[in-house]
């Protein structure tokens, strides 16, 4: 998994908390990354209808989705987050051995199921929930 999911949640909480438009520079400063990375990730959120952009003096990103109903699953889907992924596969499907030829398929199913479990868990957590946790921590 890359950091896009974390960055997206951080940006959405900032936008929710501020209640106004924020530039990619302002978001990047709070997230501790560069504005180009923010713009790249927020492009996915814009495409999903979660944020909008404005140019000009009051320009920047503005939250358009209701943070109380915007689930982390929706955010994950907007940035194409995969929580469990493995690019390398052991074995060889062309070998005459059940273990060697079957392991990649079994592991792919395992990873897919784990991603589905993560998505189901995240569907119960909203941007407002994260914001509330941040401001009620002791």
Summary of predicted features, one role per range:
Residues 64-138:
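Non-DNA-binding regulatory cores of transcription-related proteins
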Residues 21-23, 52, 128:
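Short, structured loop/turn "capping" segments at alpha-beta junctions
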Residues 1-33, 62:
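N-terminal helix-turn-helix DNA-binding core of bacterial DNA-binding proteins
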